[in-house]
Amino acid sequence: MSKKTSEKRPIIPENFTGLQEGEIPEFATGIKAIKSTLEHIARETGYSKGFSALNKMNQKEGFDCPGCAWPDPENRSSLGEYCENGAKAIAEEATKKKVDTEFFKQHSVNELLGWSDYDLGKSGRITEPMFLAEGATHYQPISWDAAFDYIGTKLKSLPTSDDAIFYTSGRTSNEAAFLYQLFARQFGTNNLPDCSNMCHESSGKALGETIGIGKGTVKLDDFAKTDLVIVMGQNPGTNHPRMLSALRETKKNGGKIITINPLPEVGLMAFKHPQKPMELLGKPTKLTDIFLQVKINGDVALLKALLLYMVCLLYTSDAADE
């Protein structure tokens, strides 16, 4: 049995995790992205298993990418509907590496608390239920029956079913999410928040009050038809690089892009489409036309200024009509 500990637990990693300073690249993706994708697939899954998964990702009759929630076009590319980030995400999901009992014997909870998310993810997939007893320093394996009994006992001990919250990820598969909500409703509650509540609760409420619906109202092909795209509060080149191909369509059709960001992210400056051979060998597509480099939290002041300007325009327009 593991011994109790009074050791102080770190909350975040105390060491830098490979941060490097260097020259800012001239463009994002291109051949480097293809090379990086191949390296991750080879290392984590092997080419056969990896490309078998990639060929099904974001395809009809396939599965959604676990990396982000970027929508899929009606006409899917036979070369693949994923980006470098998506390939890395599926490589980590389908990795050959395993985190077994010996791993948890070797590494205490306090030690693992000091690891970065990256290092934890790269360790592998767990192979059986693990349990951390009160006061213990290490996770220990338990049987599936013991795990179910423990969860059931905890749920039955609640005063009411609404005292339970069944939290999940917005990137959970449809099949798993369906079974999970069925279990929660059978238990007697509809307390089923997920990560989208944390990320989009405020925007959803504001959109509901202004346009009547708490979700986006545009379609993917609207990017190719619009005159202007304002990118604010996000780094698509880092978080959802497939958006860069949509922004590329905006520019190819004469649209303009305004970027508001403290960081001049490379992906929003110029982009080489990895599925366009001539572009890979030639010049990248310049994306951002106007870059507003606000300070951190300066976006609030900027938005207030824009709203004030719009109100002034409205009053000026009304006065002219009179």
Give residue spans per PLM region.
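Conserved small/polar residues in nucleotide/adenosyl-binding loops
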Residues: 315-322
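N-terminal export/assembly segments and adjacent metallocofactor-ligating motifs
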Residues: 2-313
